[in-house]
Amino acid sequence: MKKIKLIILFVLAACILVPSAAFAESPGIGNFEYVPRYTAGQFRDVREDQWFAGYVRSAYNFGFLRGTGAGLFEPERLLTLGEAVVLAARMRSVFFTQGAEFPTADPFFMPYVDYALRYNIIGNGERDFFAPATRAQFADMIYRSLPPGVFAQINNVPDFAIADVSPRDNFGNSIYALYRAGIFAGSDRFGTFFPNSTISRAESSAAMVRVANPALRVSMTLPAEIPAEAIFRRITDAVFMIETFDERERSIRTASGFFITSTGKALTNFHVFDFAASATVTLTNGNKYNIIGFHAVCLESNMAVFSIDAEYDNFNTLTLGNSDLAETGNLIYALGSPMQLMNSLSSGVVSSSSREVDGKYYIQFSAPISFGSGGSPLLNALGQVVGITYLSFTGGQNLNLAVPINRFWDVDILDIPVPFEQVRSLFEAGDGDGENGDYYDYENEYGDEYEDESVND
């Protein structure tokens, strides 16, 4: 199949399904004009007793969508990225011109892509338009296609209140705006989004109609806590075990780490790699991969960002929270591989939100950790990362420290990883005691050769 590619921002979104019995058709807001043009039996695969029937009818009457030919709509088929661009472009055109006339082309979506690029609905780059769109991609395009005033706030959704969306994400502003406007409200009872999930043509119709018809927007309140079992189910496969080896391929230690991008960028402690010549990660499904290089190593914050030799590009990821919001007494969880017991979950509280040790500040916590837990995520009550477990005081009980995750945003991260063998000298000193003291200027050392784009810019 012919491939046309473009990179767009990834945004997390999901649709609340409203039964058709509760559906209320009405004229649209602002410049959206509702013109009854949908006839009985317009689409042979859309029955009036199906939850999405009213949404499909309204979306058609607003001029947002058309069928797929031969009297079909294919409501359950996954929306492709090309189709998502078409919908967002048509919505914008209808809003500003009361029409959506685009020339025919092959592939059909190319005139819409040109329009979307012109009006900043999508960004430049490579992307497979024939691949399924994620809820994230679709939501971001919907928000970027219209003026902010269309999305009037009806819900109080504070920053970091959505369990798996951070305001710091590229798509964060779009998602929080759509939550607050009641366009999207999550795909489970906890309001989580699942950023890489796909979206059906029926679900996309529902979202678009909520934009045009405020009567269908969703009022909701997000929970302050999510049960531990639900957090574990959502994130367990984003956490893995690390094993490091010396030059003779003898095991040195085991530790923990977690994915921060779906393409396999991962985060752990820097000290995990002390004296290491190579390292592997083992996922919960048993798959083992080599660590091939590092996007960042920062001794000052004790963080290392690395990639593995996997071609898979849809890893589950953890959401980075705001460690400044962690308060003494808050419920927290640690998820890692203590004593090689993979993905062991423990719970406790923040014992001190700002514990000073040797001139640096850490989160002190009481969730039990052991050897092998280093580098594992410290999670808040929503399952967001607020720290990276660092050390435990052996002379006490559950006296543990974690590096606050907000330090991550001060780390310069290269898009292209520097090969493991090229940075081995950083690990040979052990615990950051090399010639560069407590901070190594990784970006200046390797940036000219390997930097393409910093994920923290």
Predicted regions located by residue number:
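Short beta->alpha transition motifs characteristic of CBS
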Residues: 261, 269-274, 346, 352, ...
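Catalytic nucleophile loop of clan PA
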Residues: 369-389
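A short, Trp-centered hydrophobic/proline-enriched beta-strand micro-motif
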Residues: 233-249, 332
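Sec-dependent N-terminal signal peptides of Gram-positive bacterial secreted proteins and lipoproteins
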Residues: 3-24
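C-terminal cap/linker of serine protease catalytic domains
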Residues: 218-234, 242, 276, 280, ...
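Conserved active-site neighborhood of the chymotrypsin/trypsin-like protease fold
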Residues: 248-254, 261-336, 340-343, 358-361, ...
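Feature responds to low-complexity, polar/acidic, surface-exposed segments characteristic
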Residues: 18-53, 66-136, 144-171, 185-198, ...
